[in-house]
């Protein structure tokens, strides 16, 4: 099935700002998150689709490639495999650089220049980490296990079985490239025998199979800054896959996801919570205590507070990871109707209700207004 347009997936226009893209992602990610939709395959697929779209459109290099070439610019499995849009391969420009390099004397877009095997940067790695809202607000240090490549001790990293040697590739004479004529064009392609290394190993190492490296695991310390938000990434330079032909290693990107909180819902640097209050407190007013990520806080509820009233506690949100300023806490009060009343309590409420209605609109202005509208509707 053809992939949907990334902008369409997030529901934004092609000229959407970074903030608009991020806001759309956060809203959809929370809607389709597996934690909120257990055993829902459709929601899981939508979450993956939204996540992929955000990964592409939040990265300037990938976004530029996608805007120019569509999915072919960022998907190595499309359009003949024009690299990974900045992750692994050299991308669209490098592919055409190999084709026209012989004509123009250099590879387009900063590709290979001159003879010798071409060095490639290693692919980037991604690690998904889930943390609590408290850890996101206050910062967190964690240890993670990630893939690591060590030089093979058996062959000391050269890829050849001990007692044998690494030879110059006979097909490309150590250049790593071969020339192929097609009509009027002479194209340079990666050597099919040595895969661009310029070397040939007659007897590959029996431990690493000629790779010179063995995959293992290593522990990394990850420092998550206070205020980090859903979907943000932390880069660890040089901890990706090793480079090819002496190229630099890729980077490791730790993508942070925040668990759903039982009390708070996050909106940027602001927090929202639903606070039930008693009928008496709503009518008479009083001080109520609410939880915050920094402890407890209290604020006055005025008498006559209606259900759905929102109170703003400034500075009780999350300190922004970029701005350094704390957001606010919005408390949405819900007036709770008492249940399982005794007969004595019911009698008191009936007496109270009669006294309120005797006062008319003075005590229940909203009810009286609604009744007036109903009367005018039927008159």
Curated annotation (Swiss-Prot):
Zn(2+) 1 binds at residues 152, 155, 205, 208. Zn(2+) 2 binds at residues 169, 172, 191, 194. Binds 2 Zn(2+) ions per monomer. PROSITE patterns: DNAJ_1 (PS00636), DNAJ_2 (PS50076), ZF_CR (PS51188). Its cofactor is Zn(2+). The keyword Signal does not apply. Pfam families: DnaJ, DnaJ_C, DnaJ_CXXCXGXG. Keywords: Chaperone, Cytoplasm, DNA replication, Metal-binding, Repeat, Stress response, Zinc, Zinc-finger. CXXCXGXG motif repeats lie at residues 152-159, 169-176, 191-198, 205-212. Residues 5-70 form the J domain. One of its GO terms (biological process) is chaperone cofactor-dependent protein refolding. A zinc finger (CR-type) spans 139-217. Gene3D superfamilies: DnaJ domain (1.10.287.110), Heat shock protein DnaJ, cysteine-rich domain (2.10.230.10), Urease metallochaperone UreE, N-terminal domain (2.60.260.20). It is found in: Cytoplasm. Belongs to the DnaJ family. Homodimer. PANTHER family: CHAPERONE PROTEIN DNAJ, DNAJ HOMOLOG 1, MITOCHONDRIAL-RELATED. The J domain is necessary and sufficient to stimulate DnaK ATPase activity. Zinc center 1 plays an important role in the autonomous, DnaK-independent chaperone activity of DnaJ. Zinc center 2 is essential for interaction with DnaK and for DnaJ activity. This is Chaperone protein DnaJ. It comes from Cupriavidus metallidurans (strain ATCC 43123 / DSM 2839 / NBRC 102507 / CH34).
């Amino acid at each position: 099935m053809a992939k949907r347009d990334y902008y369409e997936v997030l529901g934004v226009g092609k000229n959407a700002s970074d903030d608009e893209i991020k806001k759309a992602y956060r809203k959809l990610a929370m809607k389709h998150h597996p934690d909120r939709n257990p055993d829902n395959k459709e929601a899981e697929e939508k979450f993956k689709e939204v996540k992929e779209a955000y990964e592409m459109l939040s990265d300037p290099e990938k976004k530029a490639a996608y805007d120019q070439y569509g999915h072919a610019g960022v998907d190595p499995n499309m359009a003949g495999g024009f690299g990974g849009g900045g992750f692994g391969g050299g991308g669209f420009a490098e592919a055409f650089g190999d084709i026209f390099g012989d004509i123009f004397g250099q590879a387009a877009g900063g590709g290979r220049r001159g003879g010798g095997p071409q060095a490639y940067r290693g692919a980037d790695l991604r690690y998904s980490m889930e943390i609590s809202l408290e850890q996101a607000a206050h910062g967190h240090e964690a240890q993670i296990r990630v893939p690591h490549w060590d030089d093979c001790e058996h062959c000391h990293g050269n890829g050849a079985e001990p007692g044998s040697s690494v030879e110059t590739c006979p097909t490309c004479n150590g250049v790593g490239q071969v020339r192929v004529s097609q009509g009027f064009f002479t194209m340079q392609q990666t050597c099919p025998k040595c895969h661009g290394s310029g070397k040939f190993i007659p007897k590959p190492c029996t431990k690493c199979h000629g790779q010179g490296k063995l995959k293992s695991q290593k522990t990394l310390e990850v420092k998550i800054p206070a205020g980090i938000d859903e979907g943000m990434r932390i880069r660890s330079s040089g901890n990706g896959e090793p480079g090819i032909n002496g190229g630099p290693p890729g980077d490791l990107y730790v993508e942070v996801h925040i668990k759903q909180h039982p009390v708070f819902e996050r909106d940027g640097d602001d927090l929202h919570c639903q606070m039930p209050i008693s009928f008496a407190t709503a009518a008479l007013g009083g001080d109520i205590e609410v939880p915050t990520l920094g402890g407890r806080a209290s604020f006055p509820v005025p008498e006559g507070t209606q259900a759905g009233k929102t109170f703003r506690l400034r500075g009780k949100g999350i300190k922004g990871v970029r701005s350094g300023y704390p957001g606010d806490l919005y408390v949405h009060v819900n007036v709770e109707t008492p249940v399982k009343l005794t007969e004595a309590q019911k009698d008191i409420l009936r007496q109270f209700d009669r006294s309120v209605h005797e006062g008319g609109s003075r005590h229940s202005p909203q009810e009286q207004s609604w009744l007036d509208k109903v009367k005018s509707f039927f008159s």
